[in-house]
Amino acid sequence: MVLGVTTTERWWPSPFGPDDQHGMLNLVDEAKRLEALRLVREGRMYDLGHELHEDIPVFPGRFFRQTLVTTAHHANADGGVGDNDVNWVTEQVAATMQLGTHLDALSHLQIGDRGYNGCTVSELAGTAGVRRLGVETVPQVVTCGWLVDVSARRPGPGDVIVVEDLGGVDPSPGDAVLFHTGWSARWDDPARTSRASLVPATPWPSSWSSGRWR
């Protein structure tokens, strides 16, 4: 994420057309998916998601609350209900959706009043959600990936990921680049991962040059 940068550059309309809602994911086409599948040798999977719980680090004002509900709660009883003594466990969740491990939709960020494809906030925002660029428009993604490990740098406050950190990475159009920053080691330390102001709350921002690198 690039913060603390202003620009007067007009970035719309998108090269994919003024009505596009997929952004650079347009480059993940059938040929790119087949290229990615040909790279598979062992079939291993890696979970990139963190567990959601009430003490996860969040932006100020955001929250996650989960309440377990069982048949016993409903029936005020110790066992199940009916002739077959059936029981069940469900949960009630109240949360800000923009927390934990997630994928940002193109509607999430704007510079001033303009977001992707020049959409204004008033054009995007409806009373029950966004009118355009919502996460429901994001296509399924199967593509080639590059992992860049910058965790050994142990950055101080205000340090950013710069082009020089990218080393010999040479992605082609449609590839995904993932950064291992080491920040996950602080996941269970809300005092380190939550801040009262926007910029310090965003660990390891990238520089403007690395954001535009490809």
Where on the chain are the PLM-derived regions?
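Active-/binding-site microenvironments in catalytic and ligand-binding cores
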Residues: 1-214
